[in-house]
Each structure stands twice: as C-alpha cells, then as structure tokens.
C-alpha cells in the first residue's frame, strides 16, 4: 500500500528488511516522511533478482525509494514477490549506556545479545569490592528507517536522561 503510506502492512509478507526495533507505526512514519509532498514515479528496472519476472524502481521525487519485484504465475498474472528499500533510507545508531540500564527503542526493550561491553583494561578483581561490575555498553542499531527513534532508559523505576547523540546518563 505505497500510496496509503501503510508499508508496515506488507513488511512480513514481502520480507522487507528493517530493524527489529522498528514498530509498524515507526515504519509507517518514516515511509510517510520519505514520500511527503513528493510525486511517486515507477519505472521498469533491468536489475532483478533470480526468480523474479519483472522489476520496478520506485522514486519519491528525485530520490530512489525502493525496488518492487513481480513474479508471473501460470495464468500470466503478476503478483509482488519482494520489496527492497533503497540503502540510502537506512540509518545506523549507536547508544552508549551502562549495563544496569534498561534501554528501549520505539517501546521495544533492547535484547542482551544486542548489547556489547566496551573494551576496558583488565581490572584486578581484588580491587573491586562488589561481585557485580557495571560495564559501559554500546548498542548498535542497524536497518533503522526513522530519523529519530524513540530511545528511553531507566534504572529500576527511575527514568534516565537520553541525549540526542544516544548517550544515556545515570
């Protein structure tokens, strides 16, 4: 539903690659921003993946928005087989936080596997009084569509301030 701006309705069906931290609302918001007040134009494309019978390049104004791939069935009818957003639409973000902070992106809690401890020199365990060390962590978000994802952080029940650059303070 390109003209309606509800691209999220087809993201799973056509395997559109977006971050797991993008919600349907955030995807639709980013798509609406990319197409706002711009004419959508469709042109056939010579570049098509294997198993695809026809490909279209979709532009929003002067910028490429996506490629749409079609497959022909036995009755010679075409149906969409895939959609790829242009690489320029994707953004990457880095969030810097402590290991004890709970971080959410667009309302989705960041999974432990997406958090990496920042490299630090080895510290003699005899120098630390506590058995649990709080590490500084880096969270990398790739395949994001939004210009400004909603990042929130908390430690226990206390909300933590989040800077525009993605740094969390506690």
Language-model features: locations:
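Short solvent-exposed beta->alpha transition segments
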Residues: 7-63
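Short, aromatic-enriched amphipathic alpha-helices that serve as compact interaction elements
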Residues: 1-6
């Amino acid at each position: 539903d390109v003209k309606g701006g509800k691209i999220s309705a087809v993201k799973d069906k056509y395997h559109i690659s977006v971050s797991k931290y993008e919600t349907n609302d955030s995807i639709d918001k980013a798509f609406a921003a990319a197409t706002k007040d711009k004419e959508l134009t469709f042109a056939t494309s010579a570049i098509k993946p294997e198993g695809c019978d026809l490909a279209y390049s979709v532009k929003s104004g002067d910028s490429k928005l996506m490629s749409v791939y079609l497959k022909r069935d036995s009755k010679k009818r075409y149906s969409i087989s895939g959609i790829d957003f242009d690489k320029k639409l994707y953004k990457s973000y880095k969030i810097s936080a402590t290991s004890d902070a709970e971080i959410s992106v667009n309302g989705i809690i960041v999974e432990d596997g997406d958090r990496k401890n920042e490299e630090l020199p080895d510290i003699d365990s005899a120098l630390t009084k506590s058995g649990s060390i709080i590490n500084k962590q880096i969270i990398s978000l790739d395949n994001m569509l939004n210009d400004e994802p909603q990042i929130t952080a908390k430690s226990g029940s206390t909300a933590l301030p989040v800077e525009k650059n993605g740094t969390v303070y506690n």
